[in-house]
Amino acid sequence: MSGTFSENRIFLIGLSGSGKSTVGPLLASILHFTFCDTDSLIEKTSGQSIAEIFKDVGELTFRKHENIAMREAAEKDNIVIACGGGAPTFLANQEILKTGKVIWLDITPEDVSYTHLRAH
């Protein structure tokens, strides 16, 4: 990753269930950008669900996968990247976020609970 800032690289951050994976494709479509969901990328490359990764190898290994996915996505311009809910809490990921615009999807914990309940 070059570390160069690009206005055509947009990171979506927010709590799990805040709508990053829903808003991301819509925003990408409007802007004629590519969309990347880092959780989906991790699941595709690892062959495991996020829950399975956490269970089998733990959060630290998951965060390493997440950082790799974010770096790969950030190599591109004209892209909207939905980051995992905890991604911004790790220093290495914060450096990647500095390479583009960051949009925080602000949602209350109560709304997240409602969203999760509706999904199940």
Would you name each region that the model predicts?
Residues S21:
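Walker A/P-loop
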Residues S18:
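ATP-binding Walker
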Residues L12:
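Hydrophobic anchor at the beta1->P-loop junction of P-loop NTPases
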Residues T115-H120:
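Conserved small/polar residues in nucleotide/adenosyl-binding loops
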Residues K98-Y114:
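Conserved phosphate-donor/acceptor-positioning beta-strand/loop module used by diverse small-molecule
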Residues T38-I96:
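ATP-dependent small-molecule kinase phosphotransfer cores
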Residues L15:
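P-loop (Walker A) phosphate-binding loop of NTP-binding proteins
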